[in-house]
Design a protein with these regions (language model features):
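Protein-protein interaction and targeting regions used for scaffolding, dimerization, and localization
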Residues: 1-26
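Hydrophobic N-terminal alpha-helices or hydrophobic patches in metabolic proteins across all domains
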Residues: 23-192
Length: 192
């Protein structure tokens, strides 16, 4: 005699999240933590690849690694990554690169948070996504923790539903202006 085991949606989310957090870290740790500048420019180094709740993500910098580079003035910079960092595959952001994502551990989310980042002149630079964070406050704190204390690139953070975010993520026309400026984002947030 066979028995049916019934689990609730809440229990399933917990099981999936626990498995996923472990798998994400394992995949993230496959990434080369010290690629050369040439390798970074060409994207020619080992990276981690994960699928988180339907999003295909490449992890460039695992939590605890250092992200470094050279700014426009030739000054070297380096920052320790407090969260896994990578990008959504098959996307194109305002800056001409893939849309970047920081990955938290709270994967039982129903919201995604999008940060609009500005350059030194205060002009829109790009949007960065905060995936797996409990609320807007923790998402903002997580974003800022991955930059130096004198970072001035944070402009705005917006909370949005997953279905709406998916629609925006794969519409290449949408990344031309800050996320928070979209009328449909404002309408969605006003309805909550």
């Amino acid at each position: 005699m066979s028995r049916k085991i019934i689990i609730t949606e809440k229990q399933l989310k917990k099981i999936i999240s626990e498995i996923t957090n472990k798998e994400i870290t394992e995949k993230a740790n496959e990434a080369d933590k010290t690629p050369t500048e040439a390798q970074k420019k060409m994207g020619n180094y080992k990276m981690g690849h994960v699928n988180i709740n339907g999003f295909n993500i490449t992890i460039e910098n695992p939590k605890g690694s250092y992200r470094k580079g050279v700014d426009k003035n030739g000054k070297e910079w380096k920052t320790k990554m407090m969260h896994h960092y990578g990008y959504f595959t098959k996307t194109l952001g305002h800056d001409g690169d893939h849309i970047d994502v920081f990955i938290g551990t709270y994967l039982k989310y129903d919201k995604i948070f999008v940060v609009d980042q500005v350059n030194e002149n205060g002009d829109f630079d790009e949007s960065k996504v905060m995936l797996g964070f409990k609320d807007i406050k923790s998402a903002k704190e997580a974003y800022l923790s991955n930059f130096s204390s004198d970072w001035k690139g944070f402009k705005e953070i917006t909370s949005v539903s997953i279905p709406f975010f998916k629609k925006w993520l794969y519409d290449k026309k949408k990344q031309r202006k800050p996320f928070y400026e979209y009328v449909d984002v404002k309408k969605e947030n006003d309805s909550h």
